[in-house]
Amino acid sequence: MGNHKAALTKQVFTFASELYAYGVREVVISPGSRSTPLALAFEAHPNIKTWIHPDERSAAFFAVGLIKGSERPVAILCTSGTAAANYTPAIAESQISRIPLIVLTSDRPHELRSVGAPQAINQVNMFNNYVSYEFDMPIADDSKETINAIYYQMQIASQYLYGPHKGPIHFNLPFRDPLTPDLNATELLTSEMKILPHYQKSIDASALRHILNKKKGLIIVGDMQHQEVDQILTYSTIYDLPILADPLSHLRKFDHPNVICTYDLLFRSGLDLNVDFVIRVGKPVISKKLNQWLKKTDAFQILVQNNDKIDVFPIAPDISYEISANDFFRSLMEDTTINRVSWLEKWQRLEKKGRKEIKCYLEQATDESAFVGELIKKTSEKDALFISNSMPIRDVDNLLLNKNIDVYANRGANGIDGIVSTALGMAVHKRITLLIGDLSFYHDMNGLLMSKLNNIQMNIVLLNNDGGGIFSYLPQKESATDYFERLFGTPTGLDFEYTAKLYQFDFKRFNSVSEFKNATLLSETSTIYELITNREDNFKQHQILYQKLSEMIHGTL
């Protein structure tokens, strides 16, 4: 029980402190039992004024008045059950009037939902027609991830508290008995302010100078979704900053010495450098290892996204800007240059040696990477690659090294559904080659009908390892050996030659990399090129590459 109280105290005191950090100075509380933890946290906070009103409908409108008068966001808090429903009129008013009302509804813990417990209704998404953002918070526990969720969600929600996107937001907060936090732990209640510059359309370079004047910086660029990227290259050239470029950034098309492509394999093989600051541009990167590093590094992080909703994954940045990458970097060009030559050269040496190891590996490899490497070689500048999720996009991330081709993928939800159909839609306007695994292909075989009915030409390179190859890289492979093949390997034994006949595609099967090397990808027809691979062999050969890169890293640093 002591651990529960400590976890509850940490959670609600952190939540109250984060609200203060984003500008909340007043909270209107409608008394109730389930809201006890937060009510006490707000009451104990030295710089938050609490108002008490027993009628939730009136309390919410009173808060609307506070916002109008103070021009600051104000929070309202109620207990669980029908009490929350009384907030609806004021929330609707706030939506139409673009008023930053923060709605906090206390809730029963998950085990008391939908079982007939008293004062328990479905409060999740209950205001979804009227709020700009909503989230069902995790229940208090001892994990760091639960506290991080508060930081992440407040970072995301804060964009609706100020600027052009103002409007009401809703946090539903479940609490488990006992409900009283430790009121002696007031040192957890902080009054620090968060900087909110991500609504600026221009940048005050002087505000960032103390960060950008440090030597060890990185630019990390994810999916840019057709945005212009030339100023990223220009800034990197002037200020000697390495660019870790995701394959969807479209920066790998440029033969630029500062563009680093092998970073995923480098981090996967043990690279861990001290970095002063990181400028993250665009959507989150594909690389799991780079995202894990971003989550743990102490580097100051700047996020640049030209979206009205920022994507903070894998961790909330220190500062974020809603602005195009070109405008952001252009605004920083007048700063004095910093001597970072040795820092940049260290990354360039790693990149050069990493590429050499990859080249040597591909010359003798017989796994899926070797097939993907050959596909990249065969793809002309007139063609674009559409890459399926799971293993194909990861292999392309590792093997696409400065070739002038466009790469596309569905990296919103990262699912394997609808890949064939999305690629065919693109093939109406571009020459597309689809790289896809057998399970993803099976999942959307019906999508091929559009090609048959409308004569849409597209080549499909089908990596067939008869199952889910990516699961071989996850802990389940070792911890659930007796069940792995049935639950995760999921072999289907399908013969896709019949699929090709059904939808009038040409079909060619390759049982080895050497066979595929001699093949020609025809652009004037629709062909399925099936590449037969072995999951276990693929995993083992990848481990050899990781080991060689690890040895190279330790010999270079």
From Swiss-Prot:
Its cofactor is Mg(2+); Mn(2+); thiamine diphosphate. Gene3D superfamilies: 3.40.50.970, TPP-binding domain. GO terms for molecular function: 2-succinyl-5-enolpyruvyl-6-hydroxy-3-cyclohexene-1-carboxylic-acid synthase activity; magnesium ion binding; manganese ion binding; thiamine pyrophosphate binding. The keyword Cell wall biogenesis/degradation does not apply. Its EC number is 2.2.1.9. GO terms for biological process: menaquinone biosynthetic process. The keyword Metal-binding applies. Keywords: Magnesium, Manganese, Menaquinone biosynthesis, Metal-binding, Thiamine pyrophosphate, Transferase. Pathway: Quinol/quinone metabolism; 1,4-dihydroxy-2-naphthoate biosynthesis; 1,4-dihydroxy-2-naphthoate from chorismate: step 2/7; Quinol/quinone metabolism; menaquinone biosynthesis. Binds 1 thiamine pyrophosphate per subunit. It catalyses: isochorismate + 2-oxoglutarate + H(+) = 5-enolpyruvoyl-6-hydroxy-2-succinyl-cyclohex-3-ene-1-carboxylate + CO2. CDD domains: TPP_PYR_MenD, TPP_SHCHC_synthase. Belongs to the TPP enzyme family. MenD subfamily. Homodimer. Catalyzes the thiamine diphosphate-dependent decarboxylation of 2-oxoglutarate and the subsequent addition of the resulting succinic semialdehyde-thiamine pyrophosphate anion to isochorismate to yield 2-succinyl-5-enolpyruvyl-6-hydroxy-3-cyclohexene-1-carboxylate (SEPHCHC). NCBIfam families: menD (TIGR00173). This is 2-succinyl-5-enolpyruvyl-6-hydroxy-3-cyclohexene-1-carboxylate synthase. The lineage of its organism: Bacteria, Bacillati, Bacillota, Bacilli, Bacillales. The gene is menD.
